[in-house]
UniProtKB/Swiss-Prot annotation:
It is found in: Cytoplasm. SUPFAM superfamilies: Aldolase. Gene3D superfamilies: Aldolase class I. It holds the Pfam family DAHP_synth_1. This is 2-dehydro-3-deoxyphosphooctonate aldolase.
């Protein structure tokens, strides 16, 4: 699949979607994107900057949601212009799709909305690539239906049907907890869409702090290594210069100063994993 100016897939090196959970300021966005561009450029990892203008599903009404669509899109446009990287953000309503698609390179759908047929179809008809997150409540094989909805919508609009990614971000495991089943990454390949692993939301503890979500960032490297060793097209990770002060999802954000070391390990694993193909394809 062609994404931005590079190809993605199991026969290609993994690409990275990374950035702060929510846009906190223009300077932080530009600085973070610049640091990530420098790191990924040195490692040869294709990179897309991600940050949200609105967190529409926060745990409580008191939680910081973001700077709003108008200001958020202005900042993302500046990141794209000044840093020279493609940008991605999530949308939550059909009315947001057109203005957001006019600015960003890639759209992302929230996990909670993966079953909303009209929403998925509208995103698919935007003309932009879409990273579709699997709901925490959804079986991995059910993502085929979601991807098929997107493909059918694209076909109806006369658009390419190969512009969609399937993103794993963990499955609900009792109350306030998620678990990652690495088999899901192989199962989701059967959708025919490139598979992305969200390593930071997979260690989230939803609502675990009462009025906000908790997280276990120490397990991000563990799950990221496992996912890359399983074989994925891309990795999604949220990062922050100072996670303790982050306005959203700080407990599961990777400290920006640790990204180079983590990505270096993932790059080596990815090369090794994809060098000789996938044995599971021979187990029939």
């Amino acid at each position: 699949m062609k994404l931005c100016d590079f190809e993605i897939g199991l026969d290609r090196p993994f690409f990275l979607i990374a950035g702060t959970c929510v846009i906190e300021s223009e300077q932080m966005a530009i600085d973070t994107a610049g640091t990530l561009k420098e790191i990924t450029g040195a490692l040869g990892i294709p990179f897309i900057y991600k940050s949200s203008f609105d967190k529409a599903n926060r745990s409580s009404d008191a939680s910081f949601r973001g700077l709003g669509m108008e200001e958020g899109l202005r900042i993302l446009a500046e990141v794209r212009r000044q840093v020279g990287v493609p940008v991605l953000t999530d949308i939550h309503e059909i009315d947001e799709i057109k203005p957001v698609a006019s600015v960003v390179d890639v759209l992302q759908t929230p996990a909670f909305l993966c079953r909303q047929t009209d929403f998925i179809r509208a995103c698919a008809q935007s003309g932009k690539p879409v990273n579709i997150k699997k709901g925490q409540f959804l079986a991995p094989h059910d993502m085929k239906n979601v991807i098929d909805k997107a493909r059918h919508a694209a076909r109806d609009a006369g658009l390419p049907e190969d512009s969609f990614m399937a993103c794993e971000r963990g499955a609900s495991f009792g109350y306030n907890n998620l678990v990652s089943d690495m088999r899901s990454l192989a199962i989701m390949r059967e959708t025919g869409a490139p598979v992305v692993f969200d390593a930071t939301h997979s260690v989230q503890l939803p609502g675990g702090q009462g009025t906000s979500s908790g997280g276990q960032r120490e397990f991000v490297p563990v799950l990221a290594r496992a996912a890359v060793a399983t074989g994925v097209a891309g990795v999604f990770m949220e990062t922050h210069p100072d996670p303790a002060c982050a306005k959203s999802d700080g407990p599961n954000a990777v400290p920006l100063r640790r990204m180079k070391d983590l990505l270096s390990v993932l790059k080596e694993l990815d090369t090794l994993t994809k060098r000789n193909g996938f044995l599971e394809n021979q187990f029939d």
